[in-house]
């Protein structure tokens, strides 16, 4: 369910950010890995939280990890 929802509601870039978020990467590390600005990462993280109904990064990471684990 989490994976289906993630695939349906997140943009491709939000999925990229979410995967790194689920691995425990900081905003700075995500920005460096994806070649984007930290402020852009923060915007994507905010969108991910809103779209997945998560209250914080940890909860979002759990949603994302659970979705990946079902594949």
Where is each model-derived feature located?
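Basic, Lys/Arg-enriched C-terminal extension of HTH/homeodomain DNA-binding domains
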Residues: 4, 50-71
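Recognition helix of helix-turn-helix DNA-binding domains
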Residues: 24-59
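Phosphate-coordinating loops and pocket residues in cytosolic domains that bind phosphorylated ligands
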Residues: 12, 42, 62
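Regulatory hinge/linker segments at domain boundaries
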Residues: 1-19
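Short, locally clustered residues in the helix-turn-helix/winged-helix DNA-binding domain
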Residues: 22-23, 65
């Amino acid at each position: 369910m989490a994976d289906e929802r993630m695939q349906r509601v997140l943009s491709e870039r939000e999925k990229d950010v979410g995967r790194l978020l689920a691995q425990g990467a900081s905003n700075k590390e995500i920005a460096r890995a994806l070649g984007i600005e930290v402020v852009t990462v923060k915007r994507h993280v905010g969108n991910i939280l809103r779209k997945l109904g998560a209250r914080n990064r940890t909860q979002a990471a759990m949603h994302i990890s659970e979705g990946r684990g079902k594949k």
